[in-house]
């Protein structure tokens, strides 16, 4: 593989693009509008700074600890701070931003769809892109909750379509869940596993489809539980986070995680559950929808906007 195309320049899309470029791939991000270009440039600049900060930390004794070492950047036995910083600069200037979809996907070896969690939007996009996809191009979705089998028939290449799911802050949390759907041919699954390794991810294969993969099957119930405690007036975000971090030793509680993921993404996931009858729903999804919409309407989208449940330095 040589050319990798990322569909969408959001939080994870920008990270996937940067990590792929950092590892030497020719990377293009496809964006829908002129307005998206500036927003994506800003996200890429933020990701670049995250890499620089991580590399500088890795060059200290504190940074050499297991919890601080960024395995997506370098191994401990061949770490060279100057070389890593130079690679970051090269990656940053090498990423192409493109508005023309046909131009973006031309000669692509791998297309990684990283759009918001909206089934209809994804379906419409795949139907639009299908005639443009090369006969040898592999297409993957980074969807957090949607099964790839639900989208496969719209891609035009179901045998070359599967899921490749990344954790947030992929330079540090370097896992890549690779999941088949019934039409996926094994050789393309193996190629995606190999790509994940080439961009310094730990590939986690899923032999069957599972909504939420491995990580989100465990993570989403945590986030829902935290939100449920808040919207039902049980406690506040900071106290809920402390209960989790101090009680388990985890670095972040549910609300810090929500800010990292982005509240728009969280809102889109909650919308998938709002219509569940209240007597069947294990959580107060309507309360969560109202809460998250209020934050989004106020421009509080999480870390990317400088404020969500917490405030951040931009």
Residue ranges of each PLM-predicted region?
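NAD(P)-dependent Rossmann-like dehydrogenase/reductase catalytic/cofactor-binding core
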Residues: 2, 23-25, 60-61, 187-190, ...
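Structural motif
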Residues: 7, 91, 98, 114, ...
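Short glycine/serine/threonine-rich phosphate/pyrophosphate-binding segments
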Residues: 13-16, 120-123, 146-148
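Rossmann-like NAD(P)-binding element
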Residues: 50-138
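Rossmann-fold dinucleotide-binding core
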Residues: 138-208, 216
């Amino acid at each position: 593989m040589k050319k990798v195309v990322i569909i969408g320049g959001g939080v994870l899309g920008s990270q996937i693009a940067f990590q792929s470029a950092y590892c030497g791939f020719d990377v293009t991000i496809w964006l829908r509008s002129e307005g998206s270009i500036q927003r994506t440039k800003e996200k890429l600049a933020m990701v670049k700074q995250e890499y620089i900060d991580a590399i500088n930390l890795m060059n200290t004794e504190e940074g050499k600890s297991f919890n601080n070492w960024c395995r997506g950047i370098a191994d401990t036995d061949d770490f060279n701070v100057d070389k890593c910083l130079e690679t970051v600069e090269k990656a940053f200037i090498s990423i192409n931003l493109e508005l023309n979809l046909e131009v973006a996907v031309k000669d692509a070896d791998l297309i990684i769809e990283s759009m918001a969690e909206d089934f209809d939007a994804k379906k419409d996009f795949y139907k639009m892109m299908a005639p443009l996809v090369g006969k040898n191009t592999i297409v993957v979705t980074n969807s957090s909750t949607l099964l790839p089998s639900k989208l496969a028939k719209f891609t035009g290449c179901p045998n070359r379509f599967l899921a490749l799911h990344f954790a947030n802050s992929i330079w540090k949390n370097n896992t890549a869940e690779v999941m088949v759907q019934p039409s996926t041919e094994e050789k393309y699954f193996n190629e995606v596993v190999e790509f994940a390794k080439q961009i310094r991810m730990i590939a986690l294969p899923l032999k069957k489809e599972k909504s939420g993969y491995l990580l989100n099957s465990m993570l989403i119930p945590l986030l829902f539980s935290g939100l449920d405690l808040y919207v039902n007036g049980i406690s506040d975000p900071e106290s809920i986070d402390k209960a989790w971090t101090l009680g388990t030793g985890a670095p972040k509680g549910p609300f810090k995680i929500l800010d990292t993921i982005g509240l728009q993404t969280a809102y889109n996931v909650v919308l998938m559950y709002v219509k569940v009858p209240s007597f069947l729903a294990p959580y107060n999804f309507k309360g969560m929808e109202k809460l998250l919409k209020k934050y989004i309407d106020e421009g509080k989208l999480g870390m990317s906007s400088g404020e969500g449940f917490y405030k951040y330095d931009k």
